[in-house]
């Protein structure tokens, strides 16, 4: 039986003969032959191991080959629909760019640019000059530098200013960010020497003062943006640390994390320290993210005193950590939105979604509910109140009131429906709880409605 099945396996040339010319030209003969060999060998191995009792036909092998090559051509990084209500979803790409920032990236990608060319002098220029001016205008800093992420920014600052020197940090601020990246490890890699002061829940100004030695290179303050310590607590403000630092002639570095440029508490969100407030308190160097709360491209932005920034720019690590033209293009336009606060709120998707009016979200929920009326034979839809979150390790206490679309079905349980939506050609990421699938309308975009309808329709008709 086994020998008969092995003899029945189709020959590669026979299978090639039934492909149309377009498919052969599009994929190339060598690629198709390689895929067919793998498919036939897999079938042969399964026959020998008595895992199957059939040999593929030419047509079956052809179909498998087409499917495999089509799958290989699919993008690994693809569009997904965020129905979770987590605005800055770390796993779904964090912040979305504005329309104008997206266009700027496309232009930088599809044409030559003055990335490192001084158009006035007709000679080599600096990529950092393209964006330093706008950062200074918005923050009031003397100088600025952009690298590829905030962890890189803080490491570069410490290595440039505090190599082989002691850096004093409160134990309550030795944070861990995503992917197990911890401030102590970043400091160790920068060759700065960590000096911990205070306790996890309480640190006093005298703790900082008592830790000062001849080897002290800086005070480091780290904003705990992704957690809160409550109860019997005490921390030292940046302003108080700066007063002590000025008296002792020690620089102050602050990592404020998410990069808030606007006081969002006026829009009902949790109060977070802004970059401007940090600089005004006397901090010498501030680092923050270019995406997350700022709403731009992933980057680490360093602002502060010119004498320190100039020294950081000369560090050999700066070139290793430099940003590309796409990041600069996206970040420049995003920052220019901030020249007008109203424009920033309306055009930067992250800010727009976080400050979205509850009535607007309800309107969205009603619109989606109405759009899905034709699918009532497959599902039961209802609208419920709920809560969204900011995400991205920002504002851990902020809960944003929202409206959710609840989806129930007698044909498919919530676990399988969530999986089907997640595995759809344009994946739809949802919430599952209380025995149903939920879509949070806060993070649903205008182009998402049709995709949601089509996905639910196809799943219902299976």
Curated annotation (Swiss-Prot):
Any one of the GO CC terms: cytoplasm
GO MF annotation: an example: L-seryl-tRNA(Sec) selenium transferase activity
Family matches, as Pfam families: SelA
InterPro entries in alphabetical order: PyrdxlP-dep_Trfase (IPR015424), PyrdxlP-dep_Trfase_major (IPR015421), SelA-like (IPR018319), SelA_trans (IPR004534)
EC number of the protein: 2.9.1.1
Group of enzyme by EC: transferase
One GO term (biological process): selenocysteine incorporation
The keyword Glycoprotein is assigned to this record: no
Keyword Phosphoprotein tagged: no
Annotated localization: Cytoplasm
Source taxon at top rank: Bacteria
Biochemical pathway: Aminoacyl-tRNA biosynthesis; selenocysteinyl-tRNA(Sec) biosynthesis; selenocysteinyl-tRNA(Sec) from L-seryl-tRNA(Sec) (bacterial route): step 1/1
Catalytic reaction(s) noted: L-seryl-tRNA(Sec) + selenophosphate + H(+) = L-selenocysteinyl-tRNA(Sec) + phosphate
Keywords: Cytoplasm, Protein biosynthesis, Pyridoxal phosphate, Selenium, Transferase
Signal peptide stretch: none
Main location, first listed in the record: cytoplasm
Cofactor(s) listed: pyridoxal 5'-phosphate
Residues modified as N6-(pyridoxal phosphate)lysine: 292
Cited NCBIfam families: selA
Record family assignment: Belongs to the SelA family.
Function in brief: Converts seryl-tRNA(Sec) to selenocysteinyl-tRNA(Sec) required for selenoprotein biosynthesis.
Listed name of the protein: L-seryl-tRNA(Sec) selenium transferase
UniProt organism field: Clostridium perfringens (strain 13 / Type A)
Lineage: Bacteria, Bacillati, Bacillota, Clostridia, Eubacteriales
Gene assigned in the entry: selA
